[in-house]
């Protein structure tokens, strides 16, 4: 999956994007990071809570993907390092089959 596809899923507020997780392949511990979308909140886009102290939330997908909250860099900045684990709580491999990627 490329950056534009994942960003578009969040920007269009697609179903089943909450609890999306990934790690950075440059991290030897492969620590998981979480992002998601919960439409019932004023700031529906979120990151962290388990990996970012006190979590982080915002109003738009653009803010989420461009915020320098991952060691001073954004998802957009670090895209080439990202390994997707799951999207919407579904393993990425299974998700690709279900969504024909």
Language model segments and positions:
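Generic alpha-helical secondary structure signal
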Residues: 7, 38-41, 49, 53, ...
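Low-complexity, intrinsically disordered/propeptide-like segments
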Residues: 9-12, 33, 67, 87
